[in-house]
């Protein structure tokens, strides 16, 4: 009844009001970065339409199926309604809104251009999350191929090869070397399959813990990834795009270049670029031009350096950096699509070699027996 009364005050006469149920499937859903990007885009849209801030929270919150996201929006609304600024309200949720995000919102509130800043932040979040998704896709695809190949091979070795093995024992002859190797591998997996699974799990767990706890391990991994064929190029272009996109967004918001570089450092997602940005910050703080400093790092591509130089000379640095980001985002997109196209026949080839090799190994003794009988 309170909801009906509230709506009537706004000139809306509802015929029926019912409580929206919570899906059991969505009850435990986490708040994802794309949820935050959507929230930001909707906030920018609402403010552009002249909807009051507190009312915007109500409308946006109801639009999310994820109950945890609705709860987050409601908590932000409560903070703002109690007198806190939007930026300070967001700072109380650091697990969802990083320092860069909050600083940009703060700049928008201070300058009276919150709508424009939210629009820029929304674009930034959408672009960066899209880029991350493409990188995950590029990395996941070959891993999926390897896993499928291993599972198929394991099933054949554990379930199919033993059927042939009983036949081979009746031959009373020495098996071909290739067949004997496959039989030995089959016997090993039949006896030790559980230990193999535990071992693989232990390796995965150790890798995860090292990545979480050891900075040296993470640094080494980041440097190694950049040197990988195909994947290294995708990660490199992604880091350049994230660098340019972050710096363009912060600089356009009126953040001083040296301060903007603080935000850029962690946004690239790779230690090689993080170290390069730290050096650039030191150089720029002493008066060196951004493009000169980028060149001295030997990390950034010439195109990005030249576009930065043009931006500095013409006074349109944010615009030029945005063009650099868009170019490398498209490059990543094309590279991932090409990789996917390349991997499809590779999957068939790998599976064909594995399955075909096992079949040949099983039939070699039969062919030899046929030759002897002939």
Swiss-Prot record:
The chain crosses the membrane at residues 138-158, 187-207, 347-367. GO terms for biological process: protein secretion by the type II secretion system. Keywords: Cell inner membrane, Cell membrane, Fimbrium biogenesis, Membrane, Protein transport, Transmembrane, Transmembrane helix, Transport. Disruption phenotype: Deletion mutants lack surface pili showing the essential role of PilC for type IV pilus (T4P) biogenesis. In addition, PilC mutants show a diffuse cytoplasmic localization of PilB. The keyword rRNA-binding does not apply. Belongs to the GSP F family. It is found in: Cell inner membrane. The gene is pilC. Its main location: membrane. It comes from the Bacteria. It is a multi-pass membrane protein. This is Type IV pilus assembly protein PilC. Changing residue 182 to I: In strain: PAK. Homotetramer. Interacts with PilB. InterPro entries: GspF/PilC, T2SS_GspF/T4SS_PilC_CS, T2SS_GspF_dom, T2SS_GspF_sf. Essential inner membrane component of the type IV pilus (T4P) that plays a role in surface and host cell adhesion, colonization, biofilm maturation, virulence, and twitching, a form of surface-associated motility facilitated by cycles of extension, adhesion, and retraction of T4P fibers. Controls both pilus assembly and disassembly and plays an important role in PilB localization to the complex and ATPase activity. It comes from Pseudomonas aeruginosa (strain ATCC 15692 / DSM 22644 / CIP 104116 / JCM 14847 / LMG 12228 / 1C / PRS 101 / PAO1).
């Amino acid at each position: 009844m309170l909801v009906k009364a509230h709506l009537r005050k706004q000139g809306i006469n509802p015929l029926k009001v019912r409580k929206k149920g919570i899906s059991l499937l969505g009850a435990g859903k986490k708040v994802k970065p794309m949820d935050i990007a959507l929230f930001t885009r909707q906030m920018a849209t609402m403010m552009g339409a002249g909807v009051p801030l507190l009312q915007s929270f109500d409308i946006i919150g109801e639009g999310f199926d994820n109950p945890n996201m609705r709860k987050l929006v409601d908590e932000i609304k409560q903070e703002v309604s109690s007198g806190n600024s939007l930026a300070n309200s967001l700072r109380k949720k650091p697990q969802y809104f990083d320092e860069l995000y909050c600083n940009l919102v703060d700049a928008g509130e201070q300058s009276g251009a919150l709508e424009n800043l939210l629009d820029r932040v929304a674009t930034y979040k959408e672009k960066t999350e899209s880029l991350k998704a493409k990188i995950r896709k590029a990395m996941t695809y070959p891993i999926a191929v390897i896993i499928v190949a291993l599972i198929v091979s394991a099933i054949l070795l554990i379930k199919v090869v033993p059927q042939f093995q009983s036949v081979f024992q009746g031959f009373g002859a020495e098996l071909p070397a290739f067949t004997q190797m496959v039989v030995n591998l089959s016997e090993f997996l039949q006896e030790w399959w559980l230990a193999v699974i535990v071992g693989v799990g232990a390796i995965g767990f150790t890798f995860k813990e090292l990545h979480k706890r050891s900075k040296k391990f993470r640094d080494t991994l980041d440097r190694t990834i950049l040197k990988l064929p195909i994947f290294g190029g995708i990660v490199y272009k992604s880091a350049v795009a994230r660098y340019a996109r972050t710096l363009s967004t912060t600089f356009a918001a009126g953040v001083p270049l040296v301060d903007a570089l603080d935000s850029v450092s962690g946004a690239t997602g790779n230690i090689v670029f993080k170290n390069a940005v730290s050096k650039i910050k030191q150089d720029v703080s002493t008066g060196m031009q951004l493009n000169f400093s980028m060149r001295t790092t030997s990390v950034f591509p010439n195109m990005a350096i030249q576009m930065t130089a043009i931006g500095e000379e013409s006074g349109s640095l944010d615009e030029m950096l945005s063009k650099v980001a868009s170019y490398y985002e498209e490059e990543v997109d094309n590279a991932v699509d090409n990789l996917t196209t390349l991997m499809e026949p590779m999957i068939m080839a790998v599976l064909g070699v594995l399955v075909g090799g096992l079949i040949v190994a099983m039939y070699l003794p039969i062919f030899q027996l046929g030759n002897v009988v002939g």
